[in-house]
Amino acid sequence: MSTFGPEYVRAIAPYQAGKPIAEVAREFGLDEANIVKLASNENPFGVPESSKAAMAQAAADLGRYPDANGFELKAALSARYDVPADWITLGNGSNDILEIAAHAFVQKGESVVFAQYSFAVYALATQGVGGRAIVVPAVNYGHDLEAMAASIEADTRLVYVANPNNPTGTFIGAAEIEAFLQQVPANVVVVLDEAYNEYLAPEHQFESSQWVRKYPNLIVSRTFSKAYGLAGLRVGFAIAQPAVTDLMNRIRQPFNVN
Protein backbone atom coordinates (compact mmCIF):
# COMPACT_ATOMS: atom_id res chain seq x y z
CA MET A 1 0.00 0.00 0.00
CA SER A 2 1.27 3.46 -0.87
CA THR A 3 2.08 5.85 1.96
CA PHE A 4 1.09 9.43 1.30
CA GLY A 5 2.44 12.61 2.83
CA PRO A 6 5.53 13.35 4.91
CA GLU A 7 6.11 11.44 8.12
CA TYR A 8 5.73 14.55 10.28
CA VAL A 9 2.21 15.08 8.94
CA ARG A 10 1.24 11.44 9.46
CA ALA A 11 2.42 11.75 13.07
CA ILE A 12 -0.06 14.54 13.86
CA ALA A 13 -2.90 13.61 16.19
CA PRO A 14 -5.90 15.63 14.91
CA TYR A 15 -7.25 18.36 17.18
CA GLN A 16 -10.19 17.15 19.27
CA ALA A 17 -12.75 19.94 19.02
CA GLY A 18 -15.59 20.31 21.48
CA LYS A 19 -18.70 18.54 20.22
CA PRO A 20 -21.72 20.57 19.09
CA ILE A 21 -24.72 20.39 21.39
CA ALA A 22 -26.74 18.60 18.71
CA GLU A 23 -24.11 15.85 18.47
CA VAL A 24 -24.04 15.32 22.23
CA ALA A 25 -27.84 15.15 22.27
CA ARG A 26 -27.83 12.47 19.54
CA GLU A 27 -25.03 10.49 21.16
CA PHE A 28 -26.56 10.31 24.63
CA GLY A 29 -30.25 10.68 23.84
CA LEU A 30 -30.56 14.00 25.65
CA ASP A 31 -32.73 17.06 25.18
CA GLU A 32 -30.64 19.86 23.68
CA ALA A 33 -32.31 22.34 26.05
CA ASN A 34 -30.77 20.50 29.02
CA ILE A 35 -27.18 20.63 27.73
CA VAL A 36 -24.74 23.37 28.71
CA LYS A 37 -21.65 23.44 26.49
CA LEU A 38 -18.42 24.31 28.27
CA ALA A 39 -15.89 22.50 26.05
CA SER A 40 -14.81 25.38 23.80
CA ASN A 41 -15.02 28.41 26.12
CA GLU A 42 -17.67 30.10 24.01
CA ASN A 43 -19.37 33.22 25.32
CA PRO A 44 -22.54 32.11 27.16
CA PHE A 45 -24.26 35.41 26.37
CA GLY A 46 -24.10 34.73 22.63
CA VAL A 47 -23.87 37.18 19.76
CA PRO A 48 -24.28 40.89 20.63
CA GLU A 49 -27.37 42.54 19.14
CA SER A 50 -25.21 45.10 17.33
CA SER A 51 -23.32 42.27 15.64
CA LYS A 52 -26.56 40.56 14.62
CA ALA A 53 -27.74 43.79 13.00
CA ALA A 54 -24.45 44.23 11.14
CA MET A 55 -24.55 40.64 9.87
CA ALA A 56 -28.14 41.00 8.72
CA GLN A 57 -27.17 44.11 6.77
CA ALA A 58 -24.22 42.31 5.19
CA ALA A 59 -26.27 39.25 4.21
CA ALA A 60 -27.29 40.78 0.88
CA ASP A 61 -23.65 40.65 -0.25
CA LEU A 62 -22.95 37.03 0.67
CA GLY A 63 -22.77 36.13 -3.01
CA ARG A 64 -19.54 38.09 -3.28
CA TYR A 65 -16.16 37.44 -1.76
CA PRO A 66 -15.31 39.64 1.22
CA ASP A 67 -12.71 42.38 1.06
CA ALA A 68 -9.49 40.34 0.97
CA ASN A 69 -7.60 43.10 2.77
CA GLY A 70 -10.27 43.81 5.39
CA PHE A 71 -10.00 47.57 4.96
CA GLU A 72 -12.83 48.59 7.31
CA LEU A 73 -11.95 46.11 10.06
CA LYS A 74 -8.28 47.06 9.92
CA ALA A 75 -9.21 50.73 10.11
CA ALA A 76 -11.31 50.11 13.22
CA LEU A 77 -8.58 48.01 14.83
CA SER A 78 -5.98 50.61 13.90
CA ALA A 79 -7.96 53.27 15.75
CA ARG A 80 -8.67 51.01 18.74
CA TYR A 81 -5.07 49.90 19.28
CA ASP A 82 -3.31 53.02 17.99
CA VAL A 83 -1.19 51.22 15.40
CA PRO A 84 -0.96 51.71 11.61
CA ALA A 85 -3.37 49.57 9.58
CA ASP A 86 -0.50 47.85 7.76
CA TRP A 87 0.68 46.49 11.12
CA ILE A 88 -2.45 44.32 11.29
CA THR A 89 -2.94 40.84 9.82
CA LEU A 90 -6.44 39.33 9.81
CA GLY A 91 -7.02 35.66 10.51
CA ASN A 92 -9.78 33.08 10.33
CA GLY A 93 -9.87 33.20 14.11
CA SER A 94 -6.64 33.64 16.05
CA ASN A 95 -6.02 29.92 15.43
CA ASP A 96 -5.29 30.95 11.84
CA ILE A 97 -2.79 33.54 13.08
CA LEU A 98 -0.94 30.89 15.11
CA GLU A 99 -0.64 28.62 12.07
CA ILE A 100 0.29 31.46 9.71
CA ALA A 101 3.16 32.34 12.05
CA ALA A 102 4.50 28.78 11.95
CA HIS A 103 4.33 28.65 8.14
CA ALA A 104 5.89 32.09 7.74
CA PHE A 105 8.85 31.72 10.11
CA VAL A 106 9.68 28.04 10.67
CA GLN A 107 11.39 25.70 8.22
CA LYS A 108 11.41 21.92 8.51
CA GLY A 109 13.70 20.83 11.34
CA GLU A 110 13.83 24.21 13.06
CA SER A 111 12.59 24.51 16.63
CA VAL A 112 9.60 26.17 18.28
CA VAL A 113 9.38 26.84 22.03
CA PHE A 114 6.16 26.71 24.05
CA ALA A 115 5.07 25.71 27.54
CA GLN A 116 3.67 22.46 28.82
CA TYR A 117 -0.10 22.69 29.36
CA SER A 118 -0.52 25.49 26.82
CA PHE A 119 -2.84 25.66 23.80
CA ALA A 120 -2.84 22.42 21.78
CA VAL A 121 -2.56 24.27 18.46
CA TYR A 122 1.05 25.30 19.19
CA ALA A 123 2.14 21.68 18.89
CA LEU A 124 -0.08 21.08 15.86
CA ALA A 125 1.22 24.17 14.04
CA THR A 126 4.80 23.12 14.78
CA GLN A 127 4.23 19.57 13.53
CA GLY A 128 2.41 20.85 10.46
CA VAL A 129 5.55 22.57 9.16
CA GLY A 130 7.93 19.81 10.21
CA GLY A 131 9.28 21.85 13.11
CA ARG A 132 10.79 20.51 16.32
CA ALA A 133 8.86 21.28 19.49
CA ILE A 134 10.74 22.35 22.61
CA VAL A 135 8.13 21.92 25.35
CA VAL A 136 9.20 23.68 28.55
CA PRO A 137 7.85 22.14 31.79
CA ALA A 138 5.18 24.25 33.45
CA VAL A 139 5.44 25.73 36.93
CA ASN A 140 2.13 25.69 38.82
CA TYR A 141 0.43 24.89 35.49
CA GLY A 142 1.75 28.11 33.96
CA HIS A 143 4.64 29.42 31.88
CA ASP A 144 8.18 29.41 33.29
CA LEU A 145 9.46 32.30 31.21
CA GLU A 146 13.02 32.09 32.55
CA ALA A 147 13.21 28.45 31.52
CA MET A 148 11.61 29.23 28.16
CA ALA A 149 14.20 31.90 27.43
CA ALA A 150 16.97 29.48 28.41
CA SER A 151 15.46 26.80 26.13
CA ILE A 152 15.84 28.89 22.98
CA GLU A 153 18.39 27.24 20.69
CA ALA A 154 20.36 28.41 17.67
CA ASP A 155 17.68 27.06 15.32
CA THR A 156 14.68 28.36 17.29
CA ARG A 157 12.52 30.56 15.10
CA LEU A 158 9.28 30.94 17.06
CA VAL A 159 8.04 31.10 20.66
CA TYR A 160 4.37 30.87 21.66
CA VAL A 161 3.21 32.45 24.93
CA ALA A 162 -0.47 32.28 25.92
CA ASN A 163 -1.51 34.99 28.36
CA PRO A 164 -3.88 34.22 30.01
CA ASN A 165 -3.04 30.59 29.36
CA ASN A 166 -5.47 28.21 27.72
CA PRO A 167 -6.45 25.78 29.22
CA THR A 168 -5.08 26.35 32.73
CA GLY A 169 -6.06 30.02 33.18
CA THR A 170 -2.72 31.19 34.59
CA PHE A 171 -1.63 34.79 34.03
CA ILE A 172 1.72 36.58 33.66
CA GLY A 173 2.08 40.25 34.57
CA ALA A 174 3.35 42.94 32.22
CA ALA A 175 6.77 43.36 33.85
CA GLU A 176 7.53 39.65 33.61
CA ILE A 177 6.43 39.46 29.98
CA GLU A 178 8.54 42.44 28.99
CA ALA A 179 11.58 41.10 30.83
CA PHE A 180 11.17 37.90 28.81
CA LEU A 181 10.90 39.80 25.52
CA GLN A 182 14.19 41.52 26.31
CA GLN A 183 15.89 38.11 26.64
CA VAL A 184 14.64 36.68 23.34
CA PRO A 185 17.09 36.98 20.42
CA ALA A 186 16.05 39.49 17.76
CA ASN A 187 15.78 36.77 15.09
CA VAL A 188 13.25 34.73 17.09
CA VAL A 189 9.58 35.68 16.68
CA VAL A 190 7.41 35.72 19.81
CA VAL A 191 3.66 35.19 19.44
CA LEU A 192 1.84 36.61 22.46
CA ASP A 193 -1.50 34.81 22.26
CA GLU A 194 -4.06 36.95 24.08
CA ALA A 195 -7.31 35.23 23.12
CA TYR A 196 -8.60 35.62 26.69
CA ASN A 197 -7.18 39.08 27.41
CA GLU A 198 -10.57 40.77 27.76
CA TYR A 199 -11.50 38.50 30.67
CA LEU A 200 -8.74 39.92 32.86
CA ALA A 201 -9.71 42.14 35.78
CA PRO A 202 -9.02 45.81 34.97
CA GLU A 203 -6.08 45.97 37.38
CA HIS A 204 -4.35 43.15 35.46
CA GLN A 205 -4.89 44.49 31.95
CA PHE A 206 -2.11 46.17 29.99
CA GLU A 207 -1.85 47.34 26.38
CA SER A 208 0.65 44.86 25.01
CA SER A 209 -0.03 46.05 21.46
CA GLN A 210 2.20 49.05 22.15
CA TRP A 211 5.15 46.75 22.82
CA VAL A 212 5.14 45.98 19.11
CA ARG A 213 6.70 49.41 18.51
CA LYS A 214 9.63 48.43 20.74
CA TYR A 215 10.07 44.77 19.75
CA PRO A 216 10.20 44.11 15.97
CA ASN A 217 10.04 40.35 16.61
CA LEU A 218 6.74 40.47 18.55
CA ILE A 219 3.31 39.40 17.30
CA VAL A 220 0.30 40.17 19.51
CA SER A 221 -2.62 37.87 18.65
CA ARG A 222 -6.26 38.55 19.57
CA THR A 223 -9.67 37.11 18.66
CA PHE A 224 -13.35 38.02 18.45
CA SER A 225 -14.34 34.45 19.37
CA LYS A 226 -14.32 34.68 23.16
CA ALA A 227 -15.35 37.88 24.98
CA TYR A 228 -16.99 39.32 21.85
CA GLY A 229 -19.21 36.25 21.32
CA LEU A 230 -18.41 35.76 17.62
CA ALA A 231 -16.79 32.30 17.58
CA GLY A 232 -18.84 31.18 14.59
CA LEU A 233 -17.61 34.05 12.40
CA ARG A 234 -13.94 33.04 12.77
CA VAL A 235 -12.30 36.46 13.05
CA GLY A 236 -8.93 37.05 14.68
CA PHE A 237 -6.06 39.44 14.12
CA ALA A 238 -2.38 40.00 14.78
CA ILE A 239 -0.47 43.21 15.44
CA ALA A 240 3.19 43.31 14.42
CA GLN A 241 5.67 45.51 12.60
CA PRO A 242 5.48 45.60 8.76
CA ALA A 243 8.48 43.30 8.21
CA VAL A 244 6.54 40.60 10.07
CA THR A 245 3.06 41.31 8.68
CA ASP A 246 4.47 41.31 5.14
CA LEU A 247 5.59 37.69 5.51
CA MET A 248 2.38 36.66 7.26
CA ASN A 249 0.29 38.12 4.45
CA ARG A 250 2.31 36.17 1.88
CA ILE A 251 1.18 32.97 3.64
CA ARG A 252 -2.35 34.08 4.59
CA GLN A 253 -5.05 32.63 2.36
CA PRO A 254 -7.06 35.13 0.27
CA PHE A 255 -10.55 35.90 1.61
CA ASN A 256 -9.68 34.13 4.88
CA VAL A 257 -12.05 36.24 7.00
CA ASN A 258 -15.83 36.15 6.48
Residue spans of the language-model regions?
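N-terminal small-domain helix-loop-helix segment of the aminotransferase-like
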Residues: 1-93, 100
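Short acidic capping loops at alpha-helix termini that bridge into adjacent secondary structure
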Residues: 33-34, 84-88, 108-111, 155, ...
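Structural scaffold positions in well-ordered secondary structure
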Residues: 38, 159, 193-195, 221, ...
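Short glycine-rich anion-binding loops that position phosphate/pyrophosphate groups of nucleotides
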Residues: 41-44, 94-95, 119, 163-167, ...
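PLP-dependent aminotransferase class I/II
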Residues: 48, 69, 217-258
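Short hydrophobic alpha-helical segments of the AMP-binding
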Residues: 77, 122, 126, 184
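PLP-dependent aminotransferase-like
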Residues: 104-161
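Active-site pre-lysine segment of PLP-dependent enzymes
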Residues: 127, 145-155, 167-190, 194-225
